[in-house]
Amino acid sequence: MAHGPRYRVPFRRRREGKTNYHKRLALLKSGKPRLVVRKSLNHHIAQIVVYDPKGDKTIVSAHTRELMRDFGWKGHGGNTPSAYLLGLLIGYKAKKAGIDEAILDIGLHPPTRGSSVFAVLKGAVDAGLNVPHSEEIYPEDYRITGEHIANYAKALKEEDEGKYRKQFSSYLVKGLEPEKLPEHFEEVKARIIEKFEEARE
């Protein structure tokens, strides 16, 4: 509702909570491709996007479903380990497409230190993509590998196996014991690296 004669209605995408136009303008002024990271409750998505007057163009993209389909990821798509693996994947895809640098675009997600959007960033940087950042914003290594999830699962299983099976049913139905998530993480990470490193040779 208007608040007086000087009230200005915000742009539609701002009203809908989709675009911060001040931040978007600053990103566009850099002239670099954008590493766009978005997340939902169950998944993450990453894209390399370049500005075009007729509309932004997506050069490459990756989704956590792709980790499950192509690399055998059995963990949750919305957690920190899957976010890192997604970053690794989009980083390699970007390099393959000739993109060597980008600037991070997390949209309206709050820039909370250690959040999963910064796990995507770390994965992309580890793949060789040059993105300006401070390493202080990265999640701790034990969160990236999923060790915190494994430790919680172990404790819960000892305390209440019924609750353990209910909470981690999506892992168990795929044949993954959540206590072994760090090992599984390393296996999937190795598959991603192997695929793209072999393609370079």
From Swiss-Prot:
Query: What are the alphabetically sorted keywords of the record?
Result: Ribonucleoprotein, Ribosomal protein, RNA-binding, rRNA-binding
What are the record's GO terms for cellular component?
Answer: cytosolic large ribosomal subunit
Q: Name one GO molecular function term.
A: 5S rRNA binding
Q: Which GO terms describe its biological process?
A: ribosomal large subunit assembly; translation
Question: Domain of life, per the record?
Answer: Archaea
Q: Which family would the database say this protein is a member of? A: Belongs to the universal ribosomal protein uL18 family.
**Function of the protein:** This is one of the proteins that bind and probably mediate the attachment of the 5S RNA into the large ribosomal subunit, where it forms part of the central protuberance.
Subunit structure of this chain's protein: Part of the 50S ribosomal subunit. Contacts the 5S and 23S rRNAs.
Looking up PANTHER family in the UniProt record yields: LARGE RIBOSOMAL SUBUNIT PROTEIN UL18, RIBOSOMAL PROTEIN L5-RELATED
Q: What is the designated name of this protein?
A: Large ribosomal subunit protein uL18
Species per Swiss-Prot/TrEMBL record: Thermococcus onnurineus (strain NA1)
